[in-house]
């Protein structure tokens, strides 16, 4: 289950971009937030010209699962 509501509704690269930026707000420190926001922007810009629908869906699924993993890693109670 995704930590941020709406992951199942992500269908386009722009929706993914917005979803991932919302996920960043859940990270514990501002430095982490800035780091991952920068990484998200870089990745978005590097894939902006992708036009294969299957490849786009693969990227979306992978990005959501990676975001879930990162949020679980940093927000897990010890």
From Swiss-Prot:
InterPro entries: Complex1_LYR_dom, Complex1_LYR_LYRM9, Complex_I_LYR. It comes from the Eukaryota. Belongs to the complex I LYR family. LYRM9 subfamily. This is LYR motif-containing protein 9.
